[in-house]
Amino acid sequence: MKIKDYAVDTARAVAFLSRIPMPQSLFKGYDGRLGRLVRAFPFAGIVIGFIPALALLLLLGLRADPLMAALIALSIQVLVTGALHEDGLADTADGIGGGKSREQSLLIMKDSRIGTYGAIALILSLAIRAAALAVIARHSSPLTAALAIPAVAALSRGAIAWHWQRLAPAKADGVAASTGQPDEAAMQFALASAGLVAALLIWPAFGLRPLVASLLATGIAGFAFTAFIRRKLAGHTGDTLGATQQICEIATLCALATAL
């Protein structure tokens, strides 16, 4: 693997997963397929998590209340991603919660309007993540707490690669189907790099037990949700990819906070 090619893949992945602008020259001749691109999702997560992590560091350094700092950091993260993953979580919650059959669930998920299940899922997602991040901030230095954001961002986006590769598209005409199925090698590289990033960021800052807890939480949450979606929808959609990221981020932050 060439470093230049991986750097280009990372930049394209950042553009796909966020609203961070990237040079148009990187997309010249690019067909939009994501089969290989998922290998760069964890490192794209680091880039995406940098700005909210910096905000958390500055706020905690100014002795802001940890919960307030966590909420502001997560709000900035939503702005950076354009609420891409939150939208997927809400649509998936509406579809699974309101649909009585696979077909009805998929139809509901196409509706751009948010329902009761989606609203509740969004509220709980933000509340639980903010609470967990606040716990981490209260028991850590500002720099250590800030490192949790890119670490969890990398792990949760590695989980997207797993979910995407392990399930066939639920809809032949869906957006996820049009971008292609991730390569097995790309998925494995994404998982390995996500674990490496977590080890480099979490172990020195928090210790071995929080690292193990974070890895287990991401793995269990990603595996369980993928199995659940396989049973409910018999395949992935763009929305379930976003929901995977959110669920794994929630689980990992909670595990990290509990293991301190």
UniProtKB/Swiss-Prot annotation:
One of its GO terms (biological process) is cobalamin biosynthetic process. It catalyses: alpha-ribazole + adenosylcob(III)inamide-GDP = adenosylcob(III)alamin + GMP + H(+); alpha-ribazole 5'-phosphate + adenosylcob(III)inamide-GDP = adenosylcob(III)alamin 5'-phosphate + GMP + H(+). The chain crosses the membrane at residues 40-60, 64-84, 117-137, 142-162, 188-208, 209-229. Pathway: Cofactor biosynthesis; adenosylcobalamin biosynthesis; adenosylcobalamin from cob(II)yrinate a,c-diamide: step 7/7. InterPro entries: CobS. It is an enzyme of class 2 (transferase). Its EC number is 2.7.8.26. GO terms for cellular component: plasma membrane. Its main location: membrane. The keyword Magnesium applies. Coiled coil: none annotated. One of its GO terms (molecular function) is cobalamin 5'-phosphate synthase activity. It is found in: Cell inner membrane. It is a multi-pass membrane protein. It comes from the Bacteria. Its cofactor is Mg(2+). Keywords: Cell inner membrane, Cell membrane, Cobalamin biosynthesis, Magnesium, Membrane, Transferase, Transmembrane, Transmembrane helix. Belongs to the CobS family. Joins adenosylcobinamide-GDP and alpha-ribazole to generate adenosylcobalamin (Ado-cobalamin). Also synthesizes adenosylcobalamin 5'-phosphate from adenosylcobinamide-GDP and alpha-ribazole 5'-phosphate. HAMAP family: CobS. This is Adenosylcobinamide-GDP ribazoletransferase. The lineage of its organism: Bacteria, Pseudomonadati, Pseudomonadota, Alphaproteobacteria, Hyphomicrobiales.
